[in-house]
A protein has these predicted regions:
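Actinobacteria-biased recognition of intrinsically disordered, low-complexity terminal regions
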Residues: 1-15, 21, 92-96
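Residue-level signal for the start and early helices of compact helical domains
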Residues: 3-5, 33-35, 85
Length: 96
């Protein structure tokens, strides 16, 4: 896999870890910074809930990861209603 460590800011990666057919989905959540990576498990619900384990990342980075996870969770019910898969396999975002 290519190097996901950015030269500036942070990359946030959610990778689905299991089936994607229910009202919840498990993800492996990782924050990549220029010199570190922080990983935790996450359970997202199509009611907009997002439960993340501790990442060990600075609070600001962890809070951004939680916000991204909640956005993905909130979109799940809408995607299902539109006839699309509710839980993406992989989501990658970069923030400064």
């Amino acid at each position: 896999m290519r190097d996901l460590h950015p030269s500036d800011g942070a990359r946030y990666l959610l990778e689905r870890d299991g089936p994607a057919d229910g009202s919840t989905a498990r993800y492996r959540a990782t924050i990549y910074t220029p010199d570190a990576a922080f990983t935790a498990g996450a359970v997202l619900g199509d009611d907009g809930s997002a439960e993340l384990g501790p990442t060990g990342a600075p609070d600001e980075l962890h809070a951004r990861l939680v916000a991204l996870a909640r956005l993905v969770a909130r979109d799940a019910a809408r995607l299902r209603g539109d006839g699309l898969p509710p839980w993406p396999q992989r989501i990658l975002r970069w923030r400064r």
